[in-house]
């Protein structure tokens, strides 16, 4: 009988209008299974979030701010052309292409963009540009390349920060229309906030005074004879400006005539200041961080200084993200012959966007997490580690699924709203997952995982077949090469063979087809195992998107089926049970009534023999 009620609790959803209505039934089912010592009872709850945009985050330690690299995504746009052009190979364009000569024309947008990059960095107008175009990796003689296919937009939009972050960065524009708002963290979640101020000033340059453009300016058809104007660099705003001299980076700076854009600092010392911060898990021992406001570089005192030019730090990428423009001064003559020399026309714009290049680290801005910050981002952000909303609970604790949650409405008033955010799985509760009724998510999840396993198995088989085909092509090509080699040896036999004739080292092909075929065979075996494992699962009908809508109705239908099938038996048993109980009750009542009458009233015993009629008393 207990099993029947357990089945009813699992199958029958009490209300189809509210998706959280089955949560109390799950708790009740769990308690019944525990009290009856059922084999379906589990000692653990596994609670997952049903909202794909929801996650939890913990603040990253201060060492992440110094050691986490970032990648640059650089695009530019020019006046004569519409759209943006991506510079995807800065190394090749800057090392091999040198437009700063008199023989080059600058109608090509790529040439103009690279020329401006060289011009800005070589003249020192924008000192930070050196770090953007000449970063060298350690132990590698190559330059930094811009990030390919960055992931724009937020990854999660409902991220909750569990504790206070040691460091935050803030940036706001005076004109909000020019900015892309990413989110705003409250002041209580930030131990210290660095304020980045976008540049509102510009710097002018007369090309005739630059050494690199002197030869180009002598040509009659030379371009850019008019003065240029550049966007200025951003700056840091400090609440406690306590500066001290700090050494500049000249050890890893390389300057050569072939790379004039790699401008090295002239002064051996710059200006820095210290911050006293606290780690997220240690609020008793402060940590001192040194900040270089010129290059937007941070360093923890007592820690080894990271390679200065190996990567951009998060503060560097956040500060330099933006759009920087170049204008040309056009001197015009008005009708009254007055000369107007203060009109600048837009020539070219650079857009710098940076992406985190370390797995597991994200920018948290408000409640949204990002890998790449937009060029003109605006808001308050910090670095975090994030993880999904998963909880493990013991068997003696009720699933914490609130039927009501307080959410912020449009009129900024907290009001209760039905919002279940946890999805409990009963580990070992085979009835719910096997039948897939009442709880549509379990059946849908099983179907999706089955389809995913099938697709993965087919993909592995295709990869194995492709590898085998490529190996067969290589084997046939090797056979052709060996035939040609033998023919060449016969032709050049009089001169000692092909190698002696070419005066080169003899090279031979080492056939490793056995290793490749073994790898392909292992892939096929894994695909076969996945296929068998997928076939062993319950074969659900391929209803696609209709399955989540159909499964909630299966519970009531099955309940009605069981009721119609066993209803007559149950009614017969119930009638017989009531009749028996009624008969026993009537008999007991009548017996008690008779006994009571006999005890309360006295009756005389009738004589056994009747008196003699002819006997007359005297």
Swiss-Prot record:
Its tissue distribution reads: Highly expressed in placenta where it localizes to syncytiotrophoblasts of the labyrinthine zona. Specifically localizes to syncytiotrophoblast layer II (SynT-II). Also detected at very low levels in ovary.
Q: How is it modified after translation?
A: Synthesized as an inactive precursor that is heavily N-glycosylated and processed likely by furin in the Golgi to yield the mature SU and TM proteins. The cleavage site between SU and TM requires the minimal sequence [KR]-X-[KR]-R. The CXXC motif is highly conserved across a broad range of retroviral envelope proteins. It is thought to participate in the formation of a labile disulfide bond possibly with the CX6CC motif present in the transmembrane protein. Isomerization of the intersubunit disulfide bond to an SU intrachain disulfide bond is thought to occur upon receptor recognition in order to allow membrane fusion.
Q: What is the effect of changing residue 495 to R?
A: Loss of immunosuppressive activity. No effect on fusogenic activity
Which ranges of this chain reside in the Cytoplasmic compartment per its record? 567-618
Query: What CDD domains does the record tag this protein with?
Result: HTLV-1-like_HR1-HR2
Gene null: resulting phenotype: Viable, although growth is retarded and neonate numbers are reduced. In the placental labyrinth, formation of syncytiotrophoblast layer II (SynT-II) is abnormal with reduced cell fusion and progressive expansion of maternal blood lacunae. Unfused SynT-II cells form dense plaque-like structures between adjacent cells, which resemble cell junctions and are associated with high expression levels of GJB6/connexin-30. Formation of syncytiotrophoblast layer I (SynT-I) is grossly normal.
- What is its induction? In males, up-regulated in regenerating muscle tissue after injury.
The source's domain of life comes to: Eukaryota
Give the transmembrane ranges: 546-566
Which residues get glycosylated? 27, 184, 274, 357
Instruction: Kindly list the biological process annotations in GO that this record carries.
Output: labyrinthine layer blood vessel development; myoblast fusion; myoblast fusion involved in skeletal muscle regeneration; skeletal muscle tissue development; syncytium formation by plasma membrane fusion
What does the UniProt function comment say about this protein?
This endogenous retroviral envelope protein has retained its original fusogenic properties. Together with Syna, participates in trophoblast fusion and the formation of a syncytium during placenta morphogenesis. Synb is specifically involved in formation of syncytiotrophoblast layer II (SynT-II). Promotes myoblast fusion, and may play a role in regeneration of damaged muscle tissue in males. May have immunosuppressive activity.
Q: Please state what the protein is called.
A: Syncytin-B
User: What is the species listed in this Swiss-Prot or TrEMBL entry?
Assistant: Mus musculus (Mouse)
Name of the encoding gene: Synb
């Amino acid at each position: 009988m207990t099993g029947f009620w357990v089945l009813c609790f699992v199958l029958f959803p009490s209300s189809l209008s509210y998706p959280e209505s089955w949560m109390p039934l799950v708790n009740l089912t769990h308690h019944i299974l525990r009290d009856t010592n059922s084999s379906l009872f589990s000692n653990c709850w596994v609670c997952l979030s049903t909202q794909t945009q929801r996650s939890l985050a913990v603040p990253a330690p201060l060492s992440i701010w110094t050691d986490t690299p970032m990648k640059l995504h650089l695009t530019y746009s020019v006046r004569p052309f519409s759209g943006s052009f991506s510079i995807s190979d800065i190394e090749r364009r800057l090392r091999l292409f040198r437009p700063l000569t008199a023989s080059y024309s600058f109608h090509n947008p790529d040439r103009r963009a690279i020329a401006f990059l060289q011009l800005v960095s070589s003249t020192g107008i924008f000192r930070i540009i050196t770090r953007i175009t000449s970063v060298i990796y350690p132990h590698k003689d190559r330059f930094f390349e811009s990030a390919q296919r960055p992931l724009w937009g937020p990854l999660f939009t409902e991220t909750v920060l569990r504790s206070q972050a040691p460091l935050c960065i803030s940036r706001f524009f005076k004109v909000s229309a020019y900015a892309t708002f990413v989110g705003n963290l409250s002041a209580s979640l930030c131990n210290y906030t660095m304020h980045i101020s976008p540049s509102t000033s510009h710097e002018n340059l007369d090309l005739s005074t630059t050494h690199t453009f002197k030869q180009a300016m002598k040509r009659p058809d030379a371009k850019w004879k008019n003065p240029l104007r550049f966007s200025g660099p951003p700056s840091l705003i400090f609440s406690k400006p306590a500066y001290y001299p700090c050494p500049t980076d000249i050890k890893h700076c390389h300057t050569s005539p072939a790379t004039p854009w790699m401008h090295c600092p002239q002064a051996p010392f710059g200006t820095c200041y210290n911050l006293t911060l606290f780690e997220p898990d240690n609020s008793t021992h402060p940590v001192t961080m040194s900040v270089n406001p010129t290059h937007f570089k941070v360093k923890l005192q007592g820690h080894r200084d990271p390679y200065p030019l190996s990567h951009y730090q998060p503060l560097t990428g956040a500060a330099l993200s933006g759009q920087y423009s170049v204008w040309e001064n056009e001197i015009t003559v008005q009708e009254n012959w007055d000369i107007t020399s203060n009109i600048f026309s837009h020539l070219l714009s650079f857009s710098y966007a940076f992406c985190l290049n370390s797995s597991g680290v994200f920018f948290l801005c408000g409640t949204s997490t990002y890998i790449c910050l937009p060029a003109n981002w605006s808001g308050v952000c910090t670095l975090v580690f994030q993880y999904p909303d998963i909880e493990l609970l013991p068997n003696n604790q009720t699933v914490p699924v609130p039927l009501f949650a307080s959410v912020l409405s449009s009129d900024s008033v907290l009001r209760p709203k039905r919002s279940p955010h946890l999805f409990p799985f009963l580990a070992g509760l085979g009835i719910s997952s096997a039948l897939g009724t009442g709880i549509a998510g379990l059946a849908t999840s099983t179907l999706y995982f089955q389809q995913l396993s099938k697709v993965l198995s087919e993909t592995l088989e295709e990869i194995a077949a492709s590898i085998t085909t490529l190996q067969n092509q290589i084997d046939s090509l090797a056979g052709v090469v060996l035939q040609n080699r033998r023919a060449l040896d016969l032709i050049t036999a009089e001169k000692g063979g092909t190698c002696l004739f070419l005066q080169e080292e003899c090279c031979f092909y080492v056939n490793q087809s056995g290793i490749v075929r073994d790898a392909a065979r292992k892939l096929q075996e894994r695909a076969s195992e996945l296929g068998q494992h997928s076939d062993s699962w319950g074969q659900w009908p391929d209803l696609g998107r209709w399955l989540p809508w159909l499964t909630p109705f299966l519970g009531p239908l099955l309940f009605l089926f069981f009721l119609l099938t066993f209803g007559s038996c149950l009614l017969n048993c119930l009638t017989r049970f009531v009749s028996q109980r009624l008969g026993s009750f009537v008999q007991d009542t009548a017996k008690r009534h008779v006994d009571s009458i006999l005890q309360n009233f006295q009756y005389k015993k009738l004589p056994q023999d009747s008196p003699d009629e002819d006997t007359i008393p005297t």
